[in-house]
């Protein structure tokens, strides 16, 4: 992935309620990685490092890789506890960024859809396969674009953030294209309900994504050498239903 500043004005440490999210996901993460050997995990597209720090607190060594300088700066600001390493690099070339073998890998938070070409997706997955010990799991989570397109949904839930400068709104819009690509528009708005105008755009960018669906992901994983692939509908032991599930979650080995 090419580093961009699309998310430079968005502090994901603030716009996501991390403690309840991580607590909610832990049961599933433990189910997937509880037997990991070595207890060394790779975090692809680690962002601000919330999952890396959380998993380190559970006794894992975690190496987080991200192409964004801004994200990595915020990851370091959030703290680098023992057992955590953050590296700047292209996740599509992860096998040339990291060293050693891992007992598992995660690619969460809709990171994978920033890979917009199938050949690059395949390159990424093959690179991950090379740095995992035999049989180690790769956990992927992306939005279920099949459902989003079918229902015509073009936005994700808003977040309201209160800080010393006042109140802000984190808005995420989507435009789905016939070829499966997506124009994703994250925006930060300053909200002043007692002023005119009440809303001010702080930042707004169009981010090109590819809304990978289950069949495409399964084919790429198989081609990359992941012999088994189990699909879930969210970060829990819940079956995937194409027209209903919020997410496509995959455990591939």
Q: What does each model-found stretch correspond to?
A:
Residues 52-94:
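Class I SAM-dependent methyltransferase SAM/SAH-binding core
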Residues 142-216:
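SAM-dependent methyltransferase
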Residues 122-134:
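A short glycine-rich, Lys/Arg-flanked "PGG" loop and its adjoining helix->strand segment in the class I
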Residues 96-104:
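A short acidic, Gly/Pro-enriched loop at the edge of an enzyme's catalytic core
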Residues 45-49:
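Class I SAM-dependent methyltransferase "Motif I" SAM/SAH-binding loop
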Residues 208-253:
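C-terminal lobe and adjacent flexible extensions of AdoMet/dcAdoMet transferase-like proteins
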Residues 1-39:
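Conserved class I S-adenosyl-L-methionine
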Residues 135-142:
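Conserved beta-strand signature within the Rossmann-like core of class I S-adenosyl-L-methionine
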């Amino acid at each position: 992935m090419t580093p961009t500043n699309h998310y430079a004005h968005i502090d994901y440490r603030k716009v996501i309620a991390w403690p309840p999210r991580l607590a909610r996901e832990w049961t599933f993460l433990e189910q997937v990685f509880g037997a990991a050997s070595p207890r060394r995990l790779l975090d692809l597209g680690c962002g601000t490092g919330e999952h890396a720090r959380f998993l380190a607190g559970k006794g894992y060594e975690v190496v987080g890789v991200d192409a964004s300088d801004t994200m990595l700066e915020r990851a370091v600001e959030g703290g680098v506890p023992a057992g955590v390493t953050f590296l700047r690099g292209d996740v599509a070339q992860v096998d040339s960024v990291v060293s050693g073998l891992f007992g598992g890998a995660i690619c969460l938070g809709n990171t994978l859809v920033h890979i917009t070409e199938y050949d690059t997706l395949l390159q990424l997955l093959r690179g991950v396969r090379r740095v995992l010990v035999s049989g180690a799991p790769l956990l992927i989570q992306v939005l279920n674009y099949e459902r989003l397109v079918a229902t015509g949904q073009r936005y994700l839930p808003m977040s309201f953030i209160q800080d010393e400068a006042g109140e802000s709104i984190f808005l995420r819009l989507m435009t789905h294209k016939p070829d499966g690509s997506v124009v994703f528009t994250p925006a930060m708005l300053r909200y002043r309900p007692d002023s005119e105008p009440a809303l001010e755009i702080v930042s707004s960018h169009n981010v090109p994504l590819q809304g990978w669906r289950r069949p495409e992901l399964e084919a790429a994983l198989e081609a990359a050498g992941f012999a088994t692939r189990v699909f879930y509908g969210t970060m829990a032991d819940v079956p995937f239903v194409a027209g209903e599930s919020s997410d496509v979650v995959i455990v591939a080995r």
